[in-house]
Amino acid sequence: MNKQQLFENIKKKQSFLCVGLDTDIKKIPQHLLSEEDPIFAFNKAIIDATADYCVAYKPNLAFYESLGTKGMMAFEKTVAYLRENYPDQFIIADAKRGDIGNTSEMYARSFFDHIKVDAVTVAPYMGEDSVKPFLIYPEAWVILLALTSNKGSHDFQMTEDANGERLFEKVLKKSQEWANDEQMMYVVGATQGKMFLDIRKQAPNHFLLVPGVGAQGGSLAEVAQYGMNDQCGLLVNSSRAIIYADKTEAFANVAREAAHAVQKEMAGYLHDKGIIPCKA
């Protein structure tokens, strides 16, 4: 999916919501545990319930890898289900990969040749040669970690050099030599608030993947105010606040209501920016 297609889908659905599939076997409704594949059964129900109100899904690989072969099979089945039934959805593998060139090449093959996601999150710490193998796929996206939502982000990402330039700003500046805004996005945590103004000075046209809204306490209003550009430029992720909104047999319907509430708020911000003609 290219940038224009993503933007058109945002306008069509009046939403820039990404639903995070951080599926924890210990947190899904008890009645699903009798299913042959409880993780996939949960994901399928969440997807069917929320697809009308979001433009992207983001499975977090750690939750699937922790279950071994069965977990990875559930992940691959989830991606295949999305591809077959919801081809307009942007699929992000939240894997935070990044290693020396030949290792990154294998990671890229796994996600883009085999599993066929649209994007993968990548850590930039090892530099250009660890990122480039992901960029040889012209239809795929790299989502580079820039300024994350966790408290520990201040340990490195906010440190300044002698000229006052912060590390995350170096990442933004240098990485734009590797790819343009048609193939690269950045992870910026919702808890960073007004830092979006600084981000947009460095990356005015890039899409930003924004975790941290919902259970982590980030403000959607603040993200939209400071981070939205003329093509929206945002994919705001919500995981726990949607997928674990309820643990009874009604969990999917409650998740749908939670996603719809976020979508309606997003439609207002898109309208205020002049991206869509009227509120949903």
Curated annotation (Swiss-Prot):
The keyword 4Fe-4S does not apply. The active site is at residue 96. Keywords: Decarboxylase, Lyase, Pyrimidine biosynthesis. It catalyses: orotidine 5'-phosphate + H(+) = UMP + CO2. SMART domains: OMPdecase. Pfam families: OMPdecase. One of its GO terms (biological process) is 'de novo' pyrimidine nucleobase biosynthetic process. One of its GO terms (molecular function) is orotidine-5'-phosphate decarboxylase activity. InterPro entries: Aldolase_TIM, OMPdecase_type-2, OMPdeCOase_dom, RibuloseP-bd_barrel. It comes from the Bacteria. Pathway: Pyrimidine metabolism; UMP biosynthesis via de novo pathway; UMP from orotate: step 2/2. Its EC number is 4.1.1.23. Belongs to the OMP decarboxylase family. Type 2 subfamily. PANTHER family: OROTIDINE 5'-PHOSPHATE DECARBOXYLASE. This is Orotidine 5'-phosphate decarboxylase. It comes from Parabacteroides distasonis (strain ATCC 8503 / DSM 20701 / CIP 104284 / JCM 5825 / NCTC 11152).
